[in-house]
Amino acid sequence: MAATAQYLPRNNSLPSNPLMHPDSDRMHQGTTYREVQKMMHQEYLQGLATNAGHPMSLTHHQWLPNPTSDWGSGSHLGAQAEHGKSGVQSSREDLSSSFHHHRSHLVHQQTPSSHAWAQSGGHHLPSMSPGSNSHQPLIYSQSSYTNLNGMLGPQASSLHHSMRDPLHDDPGVHDTHVESPPQHLGHHQDHSDEDAPSSDDLEQFAKQFKQRRIKLGFTQADVGLALGTLYGNVFSQTTICRFEALQLSFKNMCKLKPLLNKWLEETDSTTGSPTNLDKIAAQGRKRKKRTSIEVGVKGALENHFLKCPKPSAHEITSLADSLQLEKEVVRVWFCNRRQKEKRMTPAGVPHPPMEDVYSQAETPPLHHTLQTSVQ
């Protein structure tokens, strides 16, 4: 029993290589193994007496050596051992040659390597005799499949199930089903690419749009506000300018193109009626007309500016009433006049006080004096 306990840990090393030759140095070390051989040989003789002619007992005990020799002295035992070695070697060669094939060949076709391995695995299963240890066959049978999965690589689990039932799963159909969605997705992508305009089409449309817009007499700001009134999307003058100059992104160009195309169609349909054109033009920015001031009115404003270049709000109101002008027009005129005076005065020349310069109406302004001195 002590020898059996010593043998069991060594038997745990068998799953690392179930096809290892019995003469390997890894399994034969020390005199303890010789004692185990003697004990196992005695069990073998008892097994022959109890299970005479049983194939599983013979195949199981073909690995047990004779105390006088390594492989036993019986003719039937030697022939069985030679047959086991040749079967193991042939299965090893067949298995190594089948590793280079595709995984689908191993699943769809029952190659000789799989049959040889199944047979060799069956020969290695020990007999379940009442006197033998029940834990040993479980460990040994599991190790053969464990090492098979390890030698076959990362896909060993699927291959192992396929060897038990070849019709369990069809990897070819599975691979086709997995690869089909990307093809379907690519079909939708091609369809969307066909709908999107090309860069040449966008460039040609931007050129035609600019020509037709100028011909119709609309500014870029008018087009942006008209799009907001007609379709609810207000665009700035900068956006329309960048579209015509092809400075927007391709995505924004594609979004803006159909809106501008609809606006052109709407404008072309109303070309014959000036009323509709006036409505579309009125959708643009409302800009005040430039006010033209008469010569006599401009002289009166100039005289008042010489007296007081920055009048108060009350003075502007009274001056606008006397000249029959709008209050805003008078205010803007004085602002522009002060800016003009500031531009015409050199920066290096000190600016005299306004009271001294404009104390007398007959005295010309400072810039007239400077121009006379320079001449």
Swiss-Prot record:
UniProt-recorded Gene Ontology molecular function terms: DNA-binding transcription factor activity, RNA polymerase II-specific; RNA polymerase II cis-regulatory region sequence-specific DNA binding
Protein's cellular compartments: Nucleus
Keywords: Developmental protein, DNA-binding, Homeobox, Neurogenesis, Nucleus, Transcription, Transcription regulation
Chain segments carrying region Disordered: 1-29, 56-139, 151-200
Biased composition annotated in UniProt, kind: Polar residues: 107-117, 129-139, 151-160
CDD domains given in the database record: homeodomain
Basic and acidic residues compositional bias, start-end: 162-178
Predominant place of localization: nucleus
Positions in coiled-coil regions: none
Assigned GO CC terms: nucleus
Segments of the chain annotated as binding DNA: 286-345
Function: Acts as a transcription factor. May play a role in neuronal differentiation.
This protein's name: POU domain, class 3, transcription factor 1-B
Organism whose genome encodes this protein: Xenopus laevis (African clawed frog)
Lineage: Eukaryota, Metazoa, Chordata, Craniata, Vertebrata
